[in-house]
Amino acid sequence: MSSKSHAPSEAHDSVVDAVLSASRVLVAVAARSLADVAEEVTLTQYRTLVVLASRGPQNLAGLADAVGVAPATATRMCDRLVRKDLIRRRTERDDRRQLRVALTVKGRSLVDAVTGRRRQEIARIMNEIPVEQQAVLVQALGRLASAAGEVPEQDWTTGWDL
């Protein structure tokens, strides 16, 4: 095989390695930002709240799919989040068999608090990177988030209530 055929693979490997390294940093930041709410919600429950904050009210099947859990698991998790007043359920007007769940004010406050802590720590880290490199990073991370199907920060819904 020629070195030409290996070059894209080696470049790809270096990109994957760099993203893995950065992901370790971001996982640590995420873990620290969740520490204050660890007794209130699990990581999967928090991810559920984030999905509702970013995508708005969801039916249980769509929510289960977005979070990556079985529908029965999503139902039990939503039961717990309803009891904690972090989400609420409402029956669809057009089809009373369909339930939609949405954040409550308390749920939105929890997501905002965790996101605020995460934002502060990421800002502190970013202050260590030269401004011109930050611009390149913004573009690259935006593409990464888009490729992964993540809703951009500026597009998070403000209509989180049912």
Predicted regions and their residues:
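N-terminal leader segment of winged-helix/HTH proteins
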Residues: 1-40, 158, 162
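Residue-level recognition of alpha-helical structural elements
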Residues: 8-15, 37, 64, 70, ...
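Pre-recognition alpha-helix immediately N-terminal to the DNA-recognition helix
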Residues: 21, 47-50, 109
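Alpha-helical structural segments
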Residues: 21, 25, 53-55, 66, ...
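N-terminal helix-turn-helix DNA-binding core of bacterial DNA-binding proteins
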Residues: 28-73, 84, 156
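Charged, amphipathic alpha-helical coiled-coil/dimerization segments
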Residues: 79-142
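Exposed, interaction-prone assembly regions rather than primary DNA-binding/catalytic cores
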Residues: 135-162
